[in-house]
From Swiss-Prot:
InterPro entries: ClpP/crotonase-like_dom_sf (IPR029045), COA_CT_C (IPR011763), Malonate_gamma (IPR009648). GO terms for cellular component: cytoplasm. Signal peptide: none annotated. It comes from Malonomonas rubra. It is found in: Cytoplasm. The keyword Cytoplasm applies. Keywords: Cytoplasm, Transferase. Its EC number is 2.1.3.10. Gamma subunit of the biotin-dependent malonate decarboxylase multienzyme complex (EC 7.2.4.4). The two subunits MADC and MADD are required for the transfer of the malonate carboxy group from the acyl-carrier protein (ACP) to the prosthetic group of the biotin carrier MADF. Required for the regeneration of ACP. Residues 1-281 form the CoA carboxyltransferase C-terminal domain. GO terms for molecular function: ligase activity; transferase activity. This is Malonyl-S-ACP:biotin-protein carboxyltransferase MADD. It holds the Pfam family MdcE.
Length: 292
């Protein structure tokens, strides 16, 4: 069995039409400086004979200006480069109808964001926030966005590189894929719970578990893919479904809102709806007294 963790470039080859990937080119735009954000792989490919923007992280690359950015970590420059790729995609298709806008495919295999001192001083949050905003704007502009988890989908890096997608797919747990906020050692520090207790909880509680099966239960993944060679057909299927739903005005069933409802249907997020209803009630009560 082929483990895809750390092989983002190979995943691109397995998913897109043969020899169609043109790195650092989107529409009429190109990324000239290869030394900026070397851990971010962006470009255009064909998938099912349609143009598609590809955004991935390169686990083999290292950013020499930011020593903590390696092994697929999304750093300051990588976040901005990925955001720029999305905006170039929007610009390239701005005159096209919604049903003709190219899909954006996110290949997800990242252990997190760049946690270095330089990144925090310069504003790592601005970089990741810019990328999240770009994807949200592309989604609203009509671009189908599919995230394909092939390895690690962890912490703030997955927040910006994946969770804004219309649909999230993942290779199943037999490929050693990991989806979680942080390792249990970090959870232990924050919650003050013993690591032994957290390890027990992680076996049954999707909040603490790292596998894609638990995230599927929460509605965070629309579909688990059981074979590497099945990624392409699954992605094409979801692109077609996204186009149909957007054309029918059913955007609310896609993206973060759609996954929230999906988690409730699967029995993994049963309190979400009740909490949202309580918050709405309190907000409108406050608004009626103070805002209107």
């Amino acid at each position: 069995m082929e483990i895809m963790m750390g092989q983002g470039r190979l995943a691109i080859e397995k998913i897109v039409d043969p020899e169609s990937f043109k790195e650092n080119t989107i529409g009429e735009s190109s990324f000239e400086d290869n030394e900026v954000g070397p851990g971010a792989v962006v470009g255009t490919a064909q998938i099912g004979d349609q143009d598609c923007t590809i955004i991935a992280s390169d686990a083999m690359a290292m950013n020499e200006r930011f020593p903590v950015v390696y092994a697929g970590i999304i750093g300051l420059e990588e976040g901005y480069k990925m955001a720029m790729a999305v905006y170039k995609t929007i610009e390239a298709d701005k005159e096209k109808k919604g049903t003709e806008k190219r899909p954006i495919l996110l290949i997800v295999d990242t252990p997190g964001n760049g946690p270095g001192k330089q990144e925090e001083i310069f504003g790592m949050n601005k970089s990741t926030g810019a990328y999240q905003l770009a994807l949200a704007e592309a989604r609203k502009a009509g671009h189908p966005i599919v995230a394909m988890v092939i390895g690690r989908a962890i912490s703030g890096a997955f927040l910006c590189h994946g969770l804004q997608a219309d649909r999230i797919l993942s290779l199943s747990s037999k490929f050693e894929t990991m989806i979680h906020v942080m390792p249990l050692t970090s959870v232990s520090v924050i919650t003050k719970l013993d690591i032994e207790r957290l390890e027990e909880l992680s076996k049954t509680n999707p909040v603490f578990a790292a596998g894609p099966d638990f995230f599927y239960q929460l509605g965070g993944v629309e579909e688990l893919v059981e074979e590497v060679d099945g990624m392409r057909s699954c992605i094409l299927k979801h692109i077609a479904e996204i186009r149909e739903m957007k054309a029918a005005g059913e955007e609310a069933r896609l993206g973060p809102w759609g996954r929230g409802a999906l988690g409730e249907q699967r029995g993994g997020r049963m309190i979400r709806g009740k909490v949202m209803a309580m918050m709405d009630k309190q907000f409108f009560a406050f608004a009626e007294q103070n805002l209107y």
